[in-house]
Design a protein with these regions (language model features):
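Long lumenal/extracellular ectodomains of secretory and single-pass membrane proteins
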Residues: 1-135, 145-207
């Protein structure tokens, strides 16, 4: 199925019973796979790059892998926060100790927004899937997933005409976060990829 047919499939897409069966099958497959997915050896951009051009069940499997990577990241951050809190309460309440703890807390707070350089020079080195542009876009969309709620699902492109990117779609009047594949389609849109960059315009947009 094409990306536009993911919800219904391309065989009898008007049959509600078949659509329901398809969704149940996909849900069961993803549930079974999620428990056995090992993501420790995978970088976010590797998953995102494959998801960008995936179709059919490959899309579902890669999305399950992506979600597991996001879950593991949040799990790791919570562990780090707990360790920091324990270290902070067990250490002396000196000014320097408090400042160190506050700085570390800010570092794992998730208050960040990714910026991806999508200019032409990012495509000159490496092989597809591991070029600078693949790493930049993949990590940027991953950051948009794991950022704090108020910074989540957004990013900026760094090119001749920098743009603010939204990774939210409207379904039935509701705002729904995009999948990894959909996020990559937005950030890799050929209409915004350019050959030059404009750092001043980017700063103005962010500010």
């Amino acid at each position: 199925p094409t990306p536009f047919e993911n919800d219904t499939g391309n065989r009898h897409p008007d049959d509600p019973i078949r659509i329901a069966c398809r969704k149940n099958l996909i849900s069961n497959i993803r549930s079974d796979v999620a428990g056995s997915i090992k993501t420790d050896g995978l970088d976010p951009h590797e998953i995102a790059f494959k998801a960008k051009d995936a179709c059919g069940f490959d899309t579902e499997l890669l999305q399950a892998t992506w979600e597991e990577k996001v879950r593991k990241y949040h799990e790791r951050i919570e562990t780090i926060k707990a360790q920091m809190l324990e270290k902070g309460t067990s250490s002396s309440s000196s000014s320097s100790g408090s400042e160190t703890l506050n700085a570390a807390t800010r570092a794992v707070s998730g208050r960040f927004v990714g910026v991806a350089d999508i200019s032409g020079s990012m495509t000159w080195e490496g092989t597809p899937g591991n070029r600078p542009i693949d790493i930049a876009t993949g990590l940027t969309v991953f950051m948009s997933e794991v950022a704090a709620p108020e910074y989540r699902n957004i990013a900026f492109s760094f090119n001749m005409i920098p743009q603010a990117l939204s990774f939210v779609k409207n379904i039935g009047g509701e705002s729904v976060p995009m999948t990894a594949s959909e996020r990559m389609s937005v950030i890799c849109n050929e209409n915004i990829v350019g050959y030059n960059t404009d750092i001043m315009n980017l700063h103005k947009m962010v500010i």
